Amino acid sequence: MGRGKVELKRIENKISRQVTFAKRRNGLLKKAYELSVLCDAEVALIIFSTRGRLFEFSTSSCMYKTLERYRSCNYNLNSCEASAALETELSNYQEYLKLKTRVEFLQTTQRNLLGEDLVPLSLKELEQLENQIEISLMNIRSSKNQQLLDQVFELKRKEQQLQDANKDLKRKIQETSGENMLHISCQDVGPSGHASEANQEFLHHAICDPSLHIGYQAYMDHLNQ
């Protein structure tokens, strides 16, 4: 029995899709190689995976030569427009290769900084990596110390604000105590409507000497007994 015709559609399962891509890609690259050998054909094959990874095959020493040859061919298109479009394509492709190389380098550097893939590195490269890590640690410590200093400065500023508020509160309490003392002394008068000589003398000393404010209440309690 012959095999039924398989419907071509996107494979929904991610793992199956990746496995199929790998198999079909390898088969396509193999077919391109066989075509170039058996038929002495110039073949160029470019494949991008869903993740943007590049796979390519070229029978010439450089893919650019084949693309340049492709550019020179005219498929019933305006030669100037086709040339400009292809030049843009080639420019974008070269830019992509540069970015791809840069990304791979950064990924390798990141793994090295994390202590991975260190076996291929030479002694000089390991020393350079060590210096980079030490510089990074110095920057981290400097940033941490600066944040600690900022926190200490903020705490001192808040402490000074509390001290100023405490002084202001003490001053207001002292002013209120002085006013209450004067009010009480005005009420302590004799039958004639005048304060006694003893009270007048004490009041005079109390006003002149704030240190007597504390004993004034005890003195008034003694007179009322």
Curated annotation (Swiss-Prot):
May interact with the K-box of MADS6. CDD domains: MADS_MEF2_like. It comes from the Eukaryota. GO terms for molecular function: DNA-binding transcription factor activity, RNA polymerase II-specific; protein dimerization activity; RNA polymerase II cis-regulatory region sequence-specific DNA binding. PANTHER family: SERUM RESPONSE FACTOR HOMOLOG (PTHR48019). It is found in: Nucleus. Expressed in anthers. Weakly expressed in carpels. GO terms for biological process: cell differentiation; flower development; positive regulation of transcription by RNA polymerase II; regulation of transcription by RNA polymerase II. This is MADS-box transcription factor 5. Probable transcription factor. May be involved in the control of flowering time. It comes from Oryza sativa subsp. japonica. GO terms for cellular component: nucleus. The gene is MADS5. Residues 89-179 form the K-box domain. The keyword DNA-binding applies.
